[in-house]
């Protein structure tokens, strides 16, 4: 608690010369200052927004505070429910006789909560906001498909700042108010019952007309399972610590995650920042990239938004750079002469497709019939965990997997829909180049949103080159590891990076 620091962001109407309008942000800031002094917490930054007035329309006066505090990841807990039978209590904000928060007592309460989190007495915690206790509980149930049995009580009274926690031993908090316990499905309070679907639809559909949260399923998904084993023996000199070249273009944002996963797998990653501010910078970067590829065993194209996904399409900046003859020659030598590997994730996958490295295994000019990745069916960015099913283990990257294995991976993209002509899709299937597919909770490849987050044809999430040594996939396998996604069921590791490194040993 004592390490918390605040930032502020405001959005108010145009103030002009009206003293009353000036009083609105002043009152908000005085209130924020009063709370800061009471809690002994300082604000270290803020953002001043533009005018919130258009003609005669004003935005609702708003002051938002973001609270941040450093903590060991292993000590963090979830703010959503993950199992049934969890008993939930509300810890009210201590208040004085005038119903003003007693900040000193509230700070002491927060410190006690932290101690109980560390001791294991509290496994879940969240804060009541708009809608009171009921809204906070329901939102914490929806993510993992759980319900809740409410005890009789005042569920909708505003109780800003009250803490909702699961307690194994409620005697640690004599002031705790029992709220109820998690259930398999549905929400009940006395004789009132609301189904899970009703609650979920009410929560998700409020802004559905503005932010589409559904897309019609298009097409069928044939059986793409391919039984051939992966090529696991490297032709060439072995490497105790294979070298991995990771180019970081303007807009790339996953190079550090990718390097970390390779380092943990026993490789030696090298990140090279591509500079393009001047002609001299570009020439220098081209030479540096070519030399880095020449000393590498693996080239890994990380995710991000290279070049801001311009001009008119993702991955084009990377593809254009790697079509430079000096770079292209070294990359072809790596793949065709030195038996190297290449990997592209998300934006990197888009670059591999635009280069032709998947599905063709070589850099080649693209034609109208070439496979590509285009805009998601819901016409906006998606960011969520999805399940993928392994359809082929032809690639060395998937040597630790079996056909039919299912893994959870995070996706975050606006252009992830894989499309290709029918004959190209059939060729991928026959050659075992369909590596992974989006699947439902039963492990069946599907076109249904949100299991298939972008509408990819044949539910394709990842494909390989004909020999399997180049793999492109949309899911961010590099964003997995210990102490991540604590609000979700376990995210199983594909051992993708370990398999790529093992190929050279």
For every predicted segment, state its role.
Residues 191-345, 349-360, 368, 374-383, ...:
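N-terminal beta1-alpha1 cap of cysteine-dependent amidohydrolase-like domains
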Residues 263, 282-284, 288, 332-335, ...:
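Amide-donor transfer/coupling interface in amidating biosynthetic enzymes
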Residues 1-52:
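A glycine-rich phosphate/pyrophosphate-binding beta-strand-loop-alpha-helix module
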Residues 6, 44-46, 67, 90, ...:
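General beta-strand structural signal in soluble alpha/beta enzymes
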Residues 36-37, 55-59, 79-84, 115-119, ...:
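Solvent-exposed alpha-helices and their adjacent loops that cap or buttress functional pockets
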Residues 25-27, 42, 48-159, 169-243, ...:
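Intein/HINT protein-splicing elements and their conserved insertion hotspots or analogous self-processing inserts
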Residues 1, 124-140, 251-255, 348, ...:
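Conserved phosphate/anionic-ligand binding catalytic regions in large, soluble enzymes, centered on
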Residues 164-168:
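Short hydrophobic/aromatic beta-strand micro-patches
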